[in-house]
Structure formats: C-alpha cells, structure tokens
Amino acid sequence: MKSDIRVCANWETTHDRPVYALGDRCPECDGPTENSAPAPFSPEDPYGEYRRRVRRRASE
C-alpha cells in the first residue's frame, strides 16, 4: 500500500517522536523520509485465509 504521508527514516535516533511529512525530506532534520503505510500482507496473519475465502466467494 502506498501512502502520501511519509515518516522520517531516522526518527528513532534523531527525534523523540515520529515526524511525518508529505515530501521526500524531513522538515525538522532534512533527512530522508520513507513510506509510513504498513505492509499489506503478513504471513502470520491469523485471519488472512478467511478474508481471502470471502473475497473468492464474492467474486464467483
């Protein structure tokens, strides 16, 4: 998933809290930013099988 909101890549070492931005550079430390959205798939997802089953049934 791609998000327009980005977070400072170095926030854990540079800032005391996450710093969010819309651009490619952090507004406070001028460091790079990265996508803040979580990964859309996790192998440990306990309910993923059920969601996929519902989607398959809905598309049939």
From Swiss-Prot:
Q: Extract one GO BP annotation from the record.
A: pseudouridine synthesis
Q: Which Gene3D superfamilies match?
A: H/ACA ribonucleoprotein complex, subunit Nop10
| InterPro entries the UniProt entry points to | H/ACA_rnp_Nop10 (IPR007264), H/ACA_rnp_Nop10_sf (IPR036756), Nop10_arc-typ (IPR023532)
Picking any one GO molecular function of the record gives: snoRNA binding
GO terms for CC? ribonucleoprotein complex
Instruction: Decide whether keyword Transferase is in the record.
Output: no
Which SUPFAM superfamilies does this one have?
A: Nop10-like SnoRNP (SSF144210)
For the region Disordered, what residue ranges are annotated? Answer: 29-60
Keyword set, alphabetical order: Ribonucleoprotein, Ribosome biogenesis, rRNA processing
This protein's record includes keyword Ribonucleoprotein: yes
The entry sums up its family as follows: Belongs to the NOP10 family.
Task: Describe the task this protein carries out.
Answer: Involved in ribosome biogenesis; more specifically in 18S rRNA pseudouridylation and in cleavage of pre-rRNA.
The name under which this protein is listed is Ribosome biogenesis protein Nop10
Q: What is the lineage of its organism?
A: Archaea, Methanobacteriati, Methanobacteriota, Stenosarchaea group, Halobacteria
What is the gene name?
nop10
